[in-house]
Amino acid sequence: MKKKWLKKSSAILLSLTMVLSLFPGMNGTIPTVQAAEKTSPESAYWTDVSGLKSFSLDETSDTEGRIIFGQNGSGAAQQWKIAGIDSGINGDNIILFAASPLGSSAFQKEYNTNKPYDPNWNCTYPDGTIVSEVFPNHYGVSDLRAELNTYMRDNSYFSESEKTKMNQTTIYTDDKNNSTTYSVTDILYAPYGDYYRPNDKYVTVGTNTSDKLNGGVMINISKWGNDIFWLRSPSDTFKSKALVVCPGQSVCADSVEDINSLVPAFDLNLSDVSFASAAEAASSSYSGFKANDTDNTMTANTYTLRYKSSGNEEAVISLNGTEINVKNANEKYLMVQNNNGVYALKIDSDNQTINASDIQMGSAESDKLANFNNCKVWLESTNADRITTAKMAVTTINSIEITDITAPVAGSAFDTEAACATTGVSTTTPTVTWIHGGESVTGNAGYNTKYTASVTLTAKAGYEFASNVKATMDGKAASVTKNQDGITVSYSYKKTAPKAVSNAYFATVDDLKDCYNI
């Protein structure tokens, strides 16, 4: 136990020494006064998928998270509020609720007469239900639903690539004429609501069930916006009325022939999203430095998604953090983001080195970076379908030092814990596995036996092992094997001592076997 504690302590002390040596102004034991270092961007300006999934709209106090996705039909970018996660849909996802109307429509222009049922509406009723006609406030046949489906047919609202990121959602609604419920499966859909207190102060989006129509993800009255918009819910008392949102008041009813806004929801697939930034997608018109919350170019909690890139571009940060080597990224943009804002730099060759001092995060000379520490750095490009793909920069680990392994001693327990203080390695006290004859061994070491120590290491996020990474084990050159999750470092120790023969003139067969490891 004491030995293990000493190993951990030495590894921690060595790590601290290495970290402190990277700080400007630390020279020996005498610090010098320097300008304050920049810090990493706050989550309001840069977040991963888990951060996106943490937003909700069910409380007045909730901070609104927004995603820029698609257009509003007139060529302007459309913003969507993050309502939460749809537990009825597999995989990483969030429900998006339009932050402003996509258009307007009547719920149903033909409001006076019932409609004969048509299977082409693709409404699914409970088994055995016979439906011959429906009321004018039936969502499945409504002009409202037809208009929302129209938005998915051309590219005025969503590009073909954007449409592939949108999940279908199965939603239930009530059929008042037939005293039952039915479901439809669409991408864009109207929210559900109830005008009976206290349920009239929220609406719901996402997957629901036939026995809990208002059981989706809640959106509080304070998050509805300023427009009267249609819900998919029919009125309980009038077949020619359906429910709407009356901003700041409640859910209420309106005649189906009236024109109201369309504020739909949909489910966004996050499976290939890498991260999101408040920085807009870089372009010739969006480059250079952009400060947080300035000229609406970096708005807190309003994100542009960055999808995972499958390209061979790479940005490698030097171990001291002062430069980046960029390869295979001609015509892409290098993005550097910290707590001040973001800097977008166009790459104009396939092999380019960028110094930290080339990036100025503000108007003053002192805003030039000394290093890329505490920055989010990535390469990105945006295609004609408005899909931005990105690849995070990494710091390459070129050499590994593993220490504090005690060589095997015959008759004694193997040392199973090493120390590693190399920057970027995920653990400072890796486990040692001992190999003999191609098999792992435990317990005590044998006599006159050669053992190989094997240590598997993984890199921290933002680091990767170089293809030709070198390693030493207690100062001696070791072999390195790269694997899917990291590297395995191996070193073969000398044979353990032979077992002494107790009688110099007489030895049993067992004595000889122990002595020579037969």
Show the residue positions of the predicted features.
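Solvent-exposed, low-complexity, repeat-rich "mucin-like" stalks and linkers
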Residues: I397-G424, P498-I518
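Collagenous Gly-X-Y triple-helix signature in extracellular proteins
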Residues: E37-K332, V336-T395
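Sec-dependent signal peptide cleavage junction
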Residues: L20-S40
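Sec-dependent N-terminal signal peptides of Gram-positive bacterial secreted proteins and lipoproteins
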Residues: K7-N27
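Conserved "repeat-terminator" motif of extracellular CCP/Sushi domains
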Residues: K482-A500
